[in-house]
Structures are given as structure tokens and as C-alpha cells.
UniProtKB/Swiss-Prot annotation:
The glycine cleavage system catalyzes the degradation of glycine. The P protein binds the alpha-amino group of glycine through its pyridoxal phosphate cofactor; CO(2) is released and the remaining methylamine moiety is then transferred to the lipoamide cofactor of the H protein. GO terms for biological process: glycine decarboxylation via glycine cleavage system. The modification N6-(pyridoxal phosphate)lysine is found at K273. The gene is gcvPB. It is an enzyme of class 1 (oxidoreductase). InterPro entries: Aminotrans_V_dom, GcvPB, GDC-P_C, GDC_P, PyrdxlP-dep_Trfase, PyrdxlP-dep_Trfase_major, PyrdxlP-dep_Trfase_small. It comes from Staphylococcus epidermidis (strain ATCC 35984 / DSM 28319 / BCRC 17069 / CCUG 31568 / BM 3577 / RP62A). Its EC number is 1.4.4.2. One of its GO terms (cellular component) is glycine cleavage complex. This is Probable glycine dehydrogenase (decarboxylating) subunit 2. Belongs to the GcvP family. C-terminal subunit subfamily.
């Protein structure tokens, strides 16, 4: 959000002001009308802002100074693994042989790039315990959908097209039921037990002949390891279903236990989370999918294979669900992930998970006397606390999250998972120091104290940010999405905007 002191780029615009002039054209001008059908040609000039180079630079510099990311402060956003991204990743991604290549180049011209893709596939197979891996999916939810489409094709190939139900826990990521629906399945909820794990008896109740799969995160979204995972797999497999692993929480178990060893049939990973691709701002991400042998022939094509000492695309995948991403996915993220994996090595990845789990449990142990902790066992890489104690003073979890902004900390994930009242999900990752963790803990304790002794300070937060609280209801119901709308309504109250104009 831009403050009053930072006008929109359109508001900086002055007619005939420009940042750069092109040299005089020395070739014949050709009318665009002779090249394109009339329906593709603008009837009016695009209203681009006209600004000087200095104004342009200042505008984006001001905006960049208002950004918040893991490079500027602590970012304990639960279930998102907002870890530090090593800068060596960026150096490798900018090597000209990679950054200036084109996906339509001949295979013999991009052997280095294909080798990276192949090698990353092999690394991820080892990390996950899967038999084959595709890198094509563009992000986590895309990986979920890809795996579910593979499941669907597998069931149809085996005469089981009636299997149209996907089981998801009540603590699941919202993308799980959404991906299931998008893939043409119905979502069936399985309850959690008092330990925060899948309730085995309820699972037995919901599994039936229509079960296509169960989608699980392990550790789950509460940061708790599903101790009954082997039994869960047995129940679902005996019913003819498949096990899908949501890799959002893989950061907790690297080189400790693999999804394949737990009985999962498919897994998606988030290279932009666990493996330090830049995270946030809308992408690009990467959501590779790994599968066991019986599902390998359904993977998207092409795959990259090694043929003697050469690397090439392989389109000979008999039951493939087809291409799921133009070209071969987000290659720049592959470079960053591969650099990270090779830099860390197996022992380094194990230490990543150990430190992530240690950091989460340290915060949890220091906050347990100040907040309600729904599940008291040791957590993995993240945990969920509840703001119910503070709610009795009229303060909600949302208010405490806003107050954290005054401490220069990005708030944790709030009101998720849905089965924890006034939930706050905290994931510190492995890259934060004890000093940073202590600062966050002290801020949380201070806020807990303020809810009792000075609740207005929390209710009116944030106090130090460029803007305070947004009118989120009006923003959702009557959004102003274009500068023209803002210009038209400049002197009107936002709440008086006629929805028909939007």
C-alpha cells in the first residue's frame, strides 16, 4: 500500500514527460493495421504514465524501501518456511549460459541446462524416496493438482473410474480440497484426534470403495508428526486408494525420514520453500512431483533423461497426463534449489531439519505460560498457539498480529488451521539466530501482557507503520482495482462507491 507521501506512478505522470528517447527510426514504417486483424488493434492509446527517469527510479526505490521480506526482518509465517535464501543461489542463476538460454534451443546447445534438470530430478528422488520425479509443475498447488490428475488417470486405466473421493484432514492446507475439486474429485474430511493427528477410527469410517486417495502433510499443519502413518497407509491402500504427500512441511524431516519410506505413492515439493527459491511476491515458484514406479508412466511429458553421455527430452511416456507447464517449468528456480542442495549435502540438510525443529520447540517452550497451547507434545518445525486467553480481554489474534508489526516482525499465519480457535501458526525456520528468536518471544510476551493491562494499545495497533488498519470488508466487497476507478472516485468516500461501477 502506498502512503499519501508516495503518489501512484499514474499520479506522477505529466504529459510529454519521458524517461528515455529512442534513436530515429532508419527503416520503413509499417502500419500495424497491415499486420494484425482490426480486432487486435487498440481503438485508443494506452494510458501509460509519462514520467522522467529520476521520478521513475525514485518511485520504485520508495516502494522497495517499504517492502518487507526475510532479508529485512523475522518472518515466522507458519506453513510457509520463510527461510533465508543464500545469495550464492542468485549468483549461479545469473550465469549467462543459463540466464541467456532459450527453451526452444536445440538439445545439443543446452546440454548444461538439461544436465541441471536431470541432476535435480535425481537429487529429489533420493530426498523423497520416490522412483521418478517431474519438475514441470509451477508451484505447490499446481503440484497437488498434477499428482491428483496422475491418480485419476491411474484409477481410470485400472477400471476404477468410480473412485471420486479424496480424503483430507480437518487440519489440511486449504489448497488440498481446492486441488481435489479442481481435479474433479469430491473432498471428504477426516477428523483429528486429541493429539492433533488423524483419527484412525474416523478414517476407517470415511474410507470406502469410492476412495481415490488421502492427502496428508507429515508433520501435519499443526506441526505434529503423524505417528500412525503406516497404519493410515495400510487402511487406504487396502481400500484401493493412494497416498499423497503434501511437501509443504518437508523442512522438518530432511534426511530423517522420506515420504516414500512412509508409504506415500506421490509427493509434491516446494522448491521455493524447503530449497530456498525466492519466496513471496507472487512467484515464480516450483512444485516438482515425485511418484512410485507404478505411477511413473503417467507423469507429464517430456521428461529429461540421460542417454549415455548426453541429456535429452523423452516424450515416450505411454500413459502421460500430458504437459502441465509451457516448456519445462521455472528453470531459474531449479538452479537455485540445485545450488542449495549441493551446497548443503546430506548432512547439511539433516542439520537444517534439526535446527528448524529446535527453534520451533524453543519458542513454544518459552510462550507456553503466556498463551494457550492446544497440543502440548513436542512439535516439529512449527506449532500452533491459541489466542483464547487474550480473547477474554476483548483482544483477538488479529489484533496481536497487527501489534507485532510495531516490533518490525512479520506476523505468523493466523486463524489457520481451522480446527484451532484464534489460532496463530509460528514457523521460525532453521536460519534464525537465538537472538532473533528471543526478540520475537519477548515481543509476544509483551503483547500478551498488554492485552490485560493496556488492551487499547493492541486493539489500535499498528502504531508505527505507514498505514494502520485497512477497511478489509469494503476492500473485498467494493475493490478499486484500476487507476481509472481511483481517479473517478477521488473525491468520494470509498464506502459510497456504487458496486455497479466496479
Amino acid at each position: 500500500m502506498i502512503s499519501k507521501s508516495s503518489p501512484l506512478i499514474f499520479e506522477r505522470s505529466k504529459k510529454d514527460r519521458y524517461a528515455y528517447s529512442l534513436p530515429q527510426n532508419d527503416i520503413e514504417n509499417i502500419s500495424i493495421a497491415s499486420l494484425l486483424d482490426d480486432k487486435y488493434i487498440r481503438k485508443h492509446k494506452a494510458e501509460f504514465p509519462e514520467v522522467s527517469e529520476l521520478d521513475l527510479v525514485r518511485h520504485y526505490t520508495e516502494l522497495s524501501n517499504k517492502n518487507f521480506g526475510v532479508d529485512t526482518g523475522f518472518y515466522p509465517l507458519g506453513s510457509c518456511t520463510m527461510k533465508y535464501n543464500p545469495k550464492i543461489n542468485e549468483k549461479v542463476a545469473r550465469i549467462s549460459g543459463f540466464s541467456e538460454s532459450h527453451p526452444l534451443q536445440e538439445e545439443e546447445h543446452v546440454q548444461g541446462s538439461l544436465e541441471i534438470i536431470y541432476s535435480l530430478q535425481e537429487e529429489l528422488k533420493e530426498i523423497t524416496g520416490m522412483d521418478e520425479v517431474t519438475l514441470q509443475p509451477a508451484a505447490g498447488a499446481h503440484g497437488e493438482w498434477t499428482a491428483l490428475m496422475i491418480f485419476k488417470a491411474y484409477h481410470e486405466k485400472n477400471g476404477q473410474s468410480h473412485r471420486d473421493e479424496v480424503i483430507v484432514p480437518d487440519s489440511a492446507h486449504g489448497t488440498n480440497p481446492a486441488s481435489a475439486s479442481f481435479a474433479g474429485f469430491k473432498s471428504v474430511t477426516v477428523k483429528s484426534n486429541q493429539r492433533g493427528e488423524v483419527d484412525i477410527e474416523d478414517l476407517k469410517r470415511v474410507v470406502n470403495d469410492n476412495t481415490a486417495a488421502i492427502m496428508l502433510t507429515n508433520p501435519n499443519t499443526l506441526g505434529i508428526f503423524e505417528q500412525d502413518i503406516i497404519e493410515i497407509g495400510k487402511i487406504v491402500h487396502e481400500a484401493g486408494g493412494l497416498l499423497y504427500y503434501d511437501g509443504a512441511n518437508l523442512n522438518a524431516i530432511l534426511d530423517k525420514v522420506r515420504p516414500g519410506d512412509m508409504g506415500f505413492d506421490a509427493v509434491h515439493l516446494n522448491l521455493h520453500k524447503t530449497f530456498t527459491g525466492p519466496h513471496g511476491g507472487g512467484g515464480p515458484g516450483s512444485g516438482p512431483v515425485g511418484v512410485v514406479e507404478k505411477l511413473a508412466s503417467y507423469l507429464p511429458k517430456p521428461m529429461v533423461i540421460k542417454d549415455n553421455d548426453r541429456y535429452k527430452y523423452d516424450n515416450d511416456i505411454p500413459n502421460s497426463i500430458g504437459r502441465v507447464k509451457p516448456f519445462y517449468g521455472n528453470f531459474g528456480i531449479y538452479l537455485r534449489a540445485y545450488t542449495y542442495i549441493r551446497s548443503m549435502g546430506a548432512n547439511g540438510l539433516k542439520e537444517v531439519s534439526e535446527a528448524a525443529v529446535l527453534n520451533a520447540n524453543y519458542i513454544k517452550s518459552r510462550l507456553k505460560n503466556h498463551f494457550e497451547i492446544p497440543f502440548n507434545q513436542y512439535c516439529k518445525h512449527e506449532f500452533v498457539l491459541s489466542g483464547t486467553l487474550q480473547k477474554q480481554y476483548g483482544v483477538r489474534t488479529l489484533d496481536m498480529a497487527k501489534r507485532l508489526l510495531d516490533f518490525g516482525v512479520h506476523p505468523p499465519t493466523i486463524y489457520f488451521p481451522l480446527n484451532v480457535e484464534e489460532g496463530m501458526m509460528i514457523e521460525p525456520t532453521e536460519t534464525e539466530s537465538k537472538e532473533t528468536l528471543d526478540y520475537f518471544i519477548d515481543a509476544m510476551i509483551q503483547i500478551a501482557d498488554e492485552t490485560k493491562n493496556d488492551p487499547d494499545k493492541v486493539l489500535e495497533a499498528p502504531h508505527t507503520t505507514i498505514i494502520d488498519r485497512l477497511d478489509e470488508t469494503t476492500a473485498a466487497r467494493k475493490p478499486i482495482l484500476k487507476f481509472e476507478e481511483l481517479k473517478d472516485e477521488k473525491y468520494k468516500e470509498h464506502t459510497n462507491i456504487d458496486s455497479e461501477d466496479n
